[in-house]
Amino acid sequence: MDMMVPAQLLGLLLLWFPGSRCDIQMTQSPSSVSASVGDRVTITCRASQGISSWLAWYQQKPGKAPKLLIYAASSLQSGVPSRFSGSGSGTDFTLTISSLQPEDFATYYCQQANSFP
């Protein structure tokens, strides 16, 4: 028998981060997503000015430190499942979860950054 996990909110925050040369505003959309296990989820992030590929995506769960998922816009951090992917350059970026899993219900952040590990 198939079991449905109740839809939960993937909280997305509108965040503002300082850039290396001047202040760059990062805006995520949508502000929240109602989704179920197995869904394809797409989150977009727009920079107020071009940042090339200097964009990272983080996942944060309550009481935990943020976890780096994607760096340099599209590079998957070691150990992160391949269902996560990133794309974009310049001002428009996307994080995609190809098939949402129960452990993916969390808050996701984009961040402009001028260096990556």
UniProtKB/Swiss-Prot annotation:
Using the UniProt annotation, give all residue ranges assigned to the region (Framework-2).
Answer: 57-71
Which keywords, in A-to-Z order, does the entry hold?
Adaptive immunity, Cell membrane, Disulfide bond, Immunity, Immunoglobulin, Immunoglobulin domain, Membrane, Secreted, Signal
Q: Which interval of the chain is the signal sequence?
A: 1-22
Task: List the residue ranges of the region (Complementarity-determining-2).
Answer: 72-78
Q: Where is this region: Framework-3?
A: 79-110
Q: What domain of life?
A: Eukaryota
Its annotated function is as follows:
V region of the variable domain of immunoglobulin light chains that participates in the antigen recognition. Immunoglobulins, also known as antibodies, are membrane-bound or secreted glycoproteins produced by B lymphocytes. In the recognition phase of humoral immunity, the membrane-bound immunoglobulins serve as receptors which, upon binding of a specific antigen, trigger the clonal expansion and differentiation of B lymphocytes into immunoglobulins-secreting plasma cells.
> Subunit info?
Immunoglobulins are composed of two identical heavy chains and two identical light chains; disulfide-linked.
Q: Output this protein's name.
A: Immunoglobulin kappa variable 1D-12
The species this protein belongs to is Homo sapiens
